[in-house]
């Protein structure tokens, strides 16, 4: 059971000199226990958000923009929700207070052919957490995270650069992140300061049938010895308005730093599972290629579009997680280390078919392979085989959306998401700490489970009442996950692997709503 409330408003002056938009939302969700064991599969959630965006034009050729967003979020999963976390068998609880804002100044000249932008943003996150099991009184934690960014960018449109008209873009950016995460019960007091100075240049040439974009970015990261050079090239061929083909090459990297998922502590067998970074962890580099053809046609009163895309990404020094043992407190430790490499490649097909507002259908399907180049260990158990499969990456996935407005004031939509089979790690508990009557409730050793596939179908109906010329009242209702496609082999009880969860995150859910617009 849950509720969602939301409101937004906007105001723009008649001469477009200034404007402001505000939004606010509230969401509440009760915990959901799918298998009746007293432990939630879907946690309790309370969230408030508020934000605003505003702009002011001092002159015809300048613009100042300001935005502010705040989120207050409480999440809790586990059991015995009426008790304090340290009185339960398992609790994963976080409370986030996030405040962020941004300020930018844009100036144009020569009939908007040139633009100079300066921008800055800041985000502060204050998080209080509890990740513990078996009435652990010391599993509380606190995290403070501050990120700020400043930068500038120039965009210029020129009649000719070398051989054709072009749009030139260049900019510089500095980013600073300070993170302090304390969990004394797990003997973790981590401080991380990340400083990144970057610059980028690109040029887009526009010819009769071709558009060529070439550029690069250089980043200096304080946790990486040498600057990272990341080039990219994009070539678009468009002989007609109804057909185009594109080739793209790009590069990127992930720095050897702690990310948000590294601060999360799951529970297996009543003990915590921590993630640590390996000594000498190197950055992960990516090299991506893609090609696509896009065809549009009108067949009678029908509009059609077909997109076929092939993609390939090579990852070097790919980040992998391996279970390496236990710390002095008996908590399982996973280490983020560099693997040999990985390859992600496949084909994607998207199609659209529409007949005005009467009916529109969009369908997409992807065939993908995500494999390590060599077998990688993921468990400390020597009897568990290493794998080439990248975890939690299906080989097949797709979606469809069908919308229709068969008569005035009524419209409907049917949508679905297909998720193919994937390999998901399932960790066994330490049986030396489990009571004898629980021993046969859990797997005996770590397993890489080949999951079933899922089809998540959703239905929504809308009817709009026109109250007067300016106010409309919409009533809507429907069902999400109509077939209740949900994981069947959930771990049960207080010694379960709380990270063993896959597939749709929401069970069959009925909803009704009211929307008023002016």
Show the residue positions of the predicted features.
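Membrane-embedded beta-barrel scaffold of Gram-negative outer-membrane proteins
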Residues: 7-9, 16, 22, 117-131, ...
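Outer-membrane beta-barrel translocator/receptor signature
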Residues: 1-36, 43-50, 470
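Surface-exposed extracellular loop regions of Gram-negative outer-membrane beta-barrel proteins
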Residues: 15-34, 117-130, 167-175, 190-232, ...
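Outer-membrane beta-barrel transmembrane domain signature of Gram-negative proteins
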Residues: 94-98, 122, 126-130, 135-212, ...
């Amino acid at each position: 059971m849950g509720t969602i409330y939301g409101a937004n408003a906007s105001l723009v002056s008649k001469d477009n000199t200034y404007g402001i938009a505000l939004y606010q939302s509230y969401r509440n969700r009760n915990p959901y226990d799918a298998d009746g064991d007293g432990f939630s599969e879907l946690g309790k959630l309370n969230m408030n958000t508020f934000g605003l965006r505003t702009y002011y034009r001092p002159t015809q050729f300048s613009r100042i923009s300001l935005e502010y967003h705040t989120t207050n979020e409480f999440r809790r999963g586990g059991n015995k929700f009426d008790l304090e976390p340290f009185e339960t068998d398992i609790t994963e609880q976080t409370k986030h207070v996030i405040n962020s804002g941004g300020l930018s100044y844009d100036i144009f000249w020569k009939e908007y052919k040139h633009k100079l932008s300066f921008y800055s943003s800041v985000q502060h996150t204050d998080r209080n957490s509890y990740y513990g099991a078996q009435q652990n009184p010391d599993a509380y934690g606190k995290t403070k995270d501050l990120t700020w960014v400043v930068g500038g960018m120039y965009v210029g449109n020129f009649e000719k650069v070398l051989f054709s008209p072009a749009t030139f873009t260049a900019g510089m950016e500095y980013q600073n992140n300070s993170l302090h995460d304390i969990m004394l019960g797990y003997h973790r007091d981590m401080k991380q300061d990340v400083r990144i100075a970057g610059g980028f240049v690109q040029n887009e040439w526009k010819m009769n049938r071709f558009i060529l974009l070439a550029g690069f970015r250089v980043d200096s990261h304080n946790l990486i010895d040498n600057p990272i050079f990341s080039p990219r090239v994009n070539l678009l061929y468009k002989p007609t308005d109804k057909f185009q083909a594109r080739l793209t090459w790009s590069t990127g990297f992930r720095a050897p730093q702690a990310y948000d998922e590294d601060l999360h502590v799951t529970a297996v067998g009543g003990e915590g599972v921590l993630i640590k970074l390996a000594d000498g962890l190197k950055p992960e580099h990516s090299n991506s290629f893609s090609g696509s053809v896009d065809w549009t046609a009108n067949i009678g009163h029908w509009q059609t579009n077909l997109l076929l895309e092939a993609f390939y990404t090579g990852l070097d020094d790919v980040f992998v997680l391996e279970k390496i043992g236990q710390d002095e407190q008996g908590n399982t430790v996973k280490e983020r280390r560099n693997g040999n490499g990985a390859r992600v490649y496949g084909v994607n097909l998207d199609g659209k078919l529409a007949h005005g507002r009467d009916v529109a259908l969009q369908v997409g399907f992807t065939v993908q392979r995500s494999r390590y180049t060599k077998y990688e260990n993921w468990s400390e158990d020597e009897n568990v085989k290493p794998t080439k499969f990248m975890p939690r990456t299906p080989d097949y996935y797709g979606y469809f959306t069908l919308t229709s407005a068969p008569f005035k004031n009524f419209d409907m939509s049917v949508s679905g998401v297909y998720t193919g089979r994937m390999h998901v790690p399932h960790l066994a508990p330490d049986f030396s700490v489990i009571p004898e009557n629980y021993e046969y409730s859990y797997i005996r050793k770590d397993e890489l489970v080949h999951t079933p596939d899922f089809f998540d179908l959703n239905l929504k109906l809308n009817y709009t009442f026109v109250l007067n010329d300016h106010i409309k009242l919409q009533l809507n209702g429907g069902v999400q996950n109509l077939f209740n496609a949900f994981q069947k082999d959930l771990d049960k009880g207080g010694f379960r692997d709380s990270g063993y969860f896959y597939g749709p995150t929401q069970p069959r859910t009925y909803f009704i709503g009211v929307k008023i617009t002016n």
